Amino acid sequence: MEPRPARLGDDLRRVARAVARAHERFVAQGQVTESAVRSVVAESWRRSLDRGVDPGRESAQLVLSATDLAEARESVPWAAALPMIRSLLMEPAADSGHVVALGDADGRLLWVEGDRSLRSSAERMGFAEGALWSEDAAGTNAPGTALAIDSPVQIRTHEHFVGAVQNWSCTAVPVHDPATGQVIGVIDVTGDDSVASPLALTMVRATVAAGEQSLALGPRTGPRAATPWRLDVLGRDRADLHRGDTTTRLSARHSELL
């Protein structure tokens, strides 16, 4: 009898088991030798260990009171792009079993929206509005690590440094000020393994690019502020951002990201 051909799911599970073993050894010995551990993850593990993050911690730290959270939301530089981000990413997440988090440049989660039952589960590990998910505070995780290295990041299950987070996968992309290039926040999608897919990364990058372009164009006010956004990125050299009967062509840099 011929052996059953390997499936993608089998490969992912095999890699996950190898990463889990590597994580156990790293926590015990402080060294990574397994090739199954991606370099971006190994480097993040080392930073997490150097910062004294406890891999056995049960929950992230809540650092913002309700009043502080409201003030942080008002002062975050990209707040004007929130309606677009909701339309392109957060509202669809509620129907797809995912959670979307928007954080500031310090890794504090200012908005966490999406699937209601999944949000309740995420809150038990401290993935909630007002919590601090910087890499220095919470170890290897997509939003924190994306901010730490200023680059899109996908973290799968046992690649997380803290054990309590290892049932989750996530994709995060930093947000930049279009005028200065400075990091001003991060957008993250959290859920099962499907959120660490190439498609999920494309969707988050597209949303960030559209948000940055929106900031460059200036705030939208008046009746059109509630009009839904739509982003077209396929089959064209430059991505188009639609709102009602108005179409805005994204910059070449943002289109290249998509």
Across the structure, where does each feature detected by a protein language model lie?
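Intrinsically disordered, low-complexity terminal regulatory regions
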Residues: M1-A131, T145, L201-T207, S214-P219, ...
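Conserved short-loop catalytic and cofactor-binding motifs
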Residues: R73, D192, D245
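Intrinsically disordered, low-complexity segments enriched in polar/charged residues with Gly/Pro
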Residues: R86-L89, S96, E159-A164, A225-W229
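Sensory/regulatory domains in signal-transduction proteins
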Residues: S96, G103-L110, D115, M125-S214
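Short, charged low-complexity intrinsically disordered segments located at boundaries
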Residues: D115-R119, V173-D177, G235-L241
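Short boundary/linker motifs that mark transitions into or out of structured domains
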Residues: V204-A209, A216-S251, S255
